[in-house]
Amino acid sequence: MGPITANSSKCATEDQMILQTSLLLRINVIIMTIVAIITFILTYKALFILKIRPIFHSSTKILLYTSLLFVNVHAVIFMVIQNTALIRSFTLSDKPCEIMRTTLECRFQNHVLIFGIAGVNFNQFGLTVDRLLATIIPQSYSHMGALPGVILSVLVVACSIAAPLIIAIGDPYDDIVPNCFFFPEHSAPRANIFLVTLSTLVITSIFLNFIIIYANKKLEKGCRTRFYVTQRYQKREALISTRIISYIAASQFLGLTLYSTMVLTLRLHKSMIPISIYHNMVWWAYTVPFAAVSLPALLIYRINQVGSNRKRVINRITAKVETQEEHMKSLKELWA
């Protein structure tokens, strides 16, 4: 998302018309629509796997469901914005005074898009907090059931609703944009702060997840818990869950960082780039949909991987006669 300079009228300039009707824009819409459809399909599969595979604690499950909700809200609204732009690029290709949108017209769609972006990222941080609780207070966390996830999800939703409202404080909505994907000009400074905040949260999440993984590995190896099945199960559950959350955080960090870096670079060199090319590049620099689709994709992959590892070890245990030492080694691998 990036701001566009306001014009004195709603009519598009020659460069803006080139942007609105360009082949690159139309190809981008088609690709992003395919990504959105893949997101819907993978979400359905991820929900099914989450239901039948008891890998995560109920609190973590609540947060993962919330993440999938935000991912799909983002996919739906972005697909609507993109395809509206595609239709207008054909039907209004010879009407420069109708093809542009006012920021007031785009207000609702832009707010929902920001809500989706914020939710995906805020909830990732919520998942990290959930993993932190499972590591610091494992016994209490285990007895609280879904409560931590519910509380964190409510906070995430509230902050995500507040994000577009705060960004738009005092904005007169008196400029024009190519479509509802772009921030209003007067909101750009707060939008930049918003993007920096998201990047900071994702970096913090990755850092904390690595610490949590290390802590759980150390705790799992502790002699005092070696013969207590419940405690070892809690440590193993926390470790597996945190590893999966870390993979998701890393993919979202990559998507957001690519977006922020590329858009910042484009803004710094905006005066050197024709406006039609500049805004097309901003479209292509929007990598958030790829970060979003990685959530259900990685959930499916990692959960299936954990299940396959367990089945392989169990099959090896039951398929041959082992010495006591080999049997203990197999059991140790099963725990891993």
Swiss-Prot record:
It holds the Pfam family 7TM_GPCR_Sra. It comes from Caenorhabditis elegans. Keywords: Membrane, Transmembrane, Transmembrane helix. It is a multi-pass membrane protein. InterPro entries: 7TM_GPCR_serpentine_rcpt_Sra, Nematode_rcpt-like_serp_alpha. The keyword Membrane applies. It is found in: Membrane. Expressed in the URX sensory neuron, the ALA interneuron and in additional interneurons, pharyngeal neurons and muscle. The chain crosses the membrane at residues 29-49, 62-82, 108-128, 149-169, 193-213, 244-264, 281-301. Residues 50-61, 129-148, 214-243, 302-336 are cytoplasmic. This is Serpentine receptor class alpha-10. Belongs to the nematode receptor-like protein sra family. PANTHER family: SERPENTINE RECEPTOR CLASS ALPHA-10.
